Amino acid sequence: MNENTLKEIVRRCYLQYLSREPDDAGLKHYVHLMQTGQINEKSLIDTFKNSPEYKLAHPVEIEPDTPVDIKMKKEWNERAKMNHLFVIATNHSESEEDFWESGITECNAILGKGTNRFQNIIKNKEPSKMNVLEIGCGIGRILIPMRKIFGNMTGIDISSEMVRLGQKYVTNIPNCSIVENNGIDLSEFPDNYFDFCFSFIVFQHIPEKKIVEKYISEVSRVLKPNCLFRFQVRGTIASKPNQITTWDGVQFASDEIHKIAQANNFEIIEEGNDKDEYYWLTFRLNSINSSSRIQK
């Protein structure tokens, strides 16, 4: 086969198994291996399917027609078993010390300690009496340091394995709990219960927009009027994955977010750049009866 044909084979394998275009170095490397007879297309596929990159996106074999909530739960359980520190905080997984220190940093950044955001979060409330919810808490990296600020912290996670690991850290902390949820709603919580909700590096892994939208709708139900929801989604970054998975999830543009906010009785009081991977938003729930929300 000529070089162009080999390049196309390598490119096709990258797109199918790694969900991205090949970088120049990778393309040259695998074309050279095929030209010299060291690998063929089958062994190239095997190489990709055994790579850490592929296993993050596809940690376990699942039937194509598996419901998305079951798929998310199974795949995140497997990721937690592989390396829970890495899949929670990829850039802070070299040591447990770095991992937990990063949680303190992220806690302060989310709350905006020393800024107007923090004042808006605790407005007219005593922090020691506030109920706070984290969506997608993992093993409690951010939840645990935040419990020093607020009266009661609840973290939910779709992965029973993450919950099992996390409960070891919160067992003796009376105002902090980690519970498993179904990954698609907040049905275990009553209306108007929380004083603040937040989520970080969670919605970016969800493979369907309707699930993210459902979570936002559910937050508008469980959050008290005039309280805040601080969260992050994946913006419309240039390096969009070729295949949406439970690792490389959906992206949102600003106009979509504004429509979702309006439909769920939220006012956007902070908005980051929707072209960033970490597209941050702060919503405030308007103080009208929840039954007045636009039904979707």
Each language-model region and where it sits:
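A short SAM/SAH-binding and catalytic strip from SAM-dependent methyltransferases
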Residues: F196-K210
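Substrate/cofactor-recognition hotspot
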Residues: M1-E61
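A short glycine-rich, Lys/Arg-flanked "PGG" loop and its adjoining helix->strand segment in the class I
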Residues: E213-P225
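Helix-turn-helix-type domain boundary/helix-start signal
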Residues: Q16-R20, S187, V250
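Active-site acidic short loop of glycosyltransferases
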Residues: I173, D191-N192, P225
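A short acidic, Gly/Pro-enriched loop at the edge of an enzyme's catalytic core
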Residues: S187-C197
